[in-house]
Amino acid sequence: MRIRFAMLGVLLGGLFSIAPAQDRPPIRDNSFLVEEAYNQEPRVVQHISVLALTRRSSDWEYGFTQEWPLGSQRHQLSVTIPILNAADATGVGDIAVNYRYQLAFNDATGNALAPRFSVILPTGDADRGRGTSSLGLQVNLPASLGVHRSLVTHWNVGGTWTASARAPGGGRVATRDIAAAASAIWLLTRQLNLMLEAAWAREEIAIAADTRVAEESAWLSPGLRAAIDFSSGLQIVPGLAFPIGIGPSDGERRVLFYLSFEHGF
């Protein structure tokens, strides 16, 4: 509980940032469950940490992502490293190497489109539920739409194909996952945003040789984020959200902490 109040204090503190906010653009590329369609600006790198805690459980998930522009905003390379804890066992999951192409971008309206292609490396332990022990390919289509100068929406649809997922007891099978997500971001100020995100996924899990089962999940997540800008160009964005399980995930609750550092290089 103390951690939550401390994070809330930092978020509200974003209203009184160190650097003047008038010449700063509004917060854009800092979503939690939904992928926005804004690539990194030239010579600006972003380091993103997301920690999700499961209520009334010791399980947690942490993800670290680093994003770099490749020469310009049109091309972006990133790496996502997940660390998972379940049943008091902690380890690295399957690492994703991502390329994203800025197909369309309008700075004035906030409208953007940026398809992403990812290679998922078999770095996790399948026997402990932290990976598939197989190479995977993933595609996602993030679209961002500025509805109003104070309201931006983000939309995602994508899928993952795993060539030969390994079941915990042995045996392999190809799996296919699909996912969709959407969000509405209210720009309360340039440095403080209220968020409502929704995410749904259908994942196939290998349980034996040539045998898989499908599991669905659905979440509705209210949250907020704030920007703390420094005269050096460094921007720190802390965020807090409370994902609520709906439909197939009814009854599940999580607390999500977000922290981003963005700076030039």
Language-model region placement:
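Cleavable N-terminal export/targeting peptides
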Residues: M1-R28
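Transmembrane beta-barrel domains of Gram-negative outer membranes and organellar outer membranes
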Residues: A21-F265
